[in-house]
Amino acid sequence: MRKMRKFLNILFLCTLALGLSSCEPDDGEDYYIYDTLPGGIWVGDLGFADAYNSPLESGLYFEGNGVGKDEQAYYNDPYGEVAFRLPFRWDIHGRILRLDYGYNYPLLEIYDVYVAGDRLSGVLYVDGHMDGPVMQERQY
């Protein structure tokens, strides 16, 4: 009887430990994405355009200290020369990647951000309004 009670107590404690650990938020994925972004340039469309409404492709350089730069080029430029350079601050929390370009630009957030190999995908929000799906590809 004592052995059975001891066994049930151990089983109860194991179940309790598993149950409590599953209630904690999983920041492991945030750390993985945070560590994956620096290195290379992430190229794709983030909705930027010039004064004449010509679309620009963004090339994002992420640094490990939460800052980065966006080198933008015209889609139809065969040489891919940089037309604009914009600094930004970035962070990730709860699978939301925030790109803050400062007061003169809207806050960009990529929800449900997912990195698989050299592709980053998610849903782009501009100042809190959904813009649509986005995908960036890493180039070296």
Could you tell me what each predicted segment is?
Residues 31-34, 89, 112:
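Short secondary-structure boundary/capping segments
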Residues 2-10:
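Bacterial N-terminal signal peptides that target proteins for export
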Residues 38, 42, 66-68, 120:
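Structural detector for hydrophobic anchor residues on beta-strands
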Residues 9-17:
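Hydrophobic helical h-region of N-terminal Sec-dependent signal peptides
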Residues 27-43, 140:
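N-terminal helix-cap/turn-to-beta initiation motif at the start of protein domains
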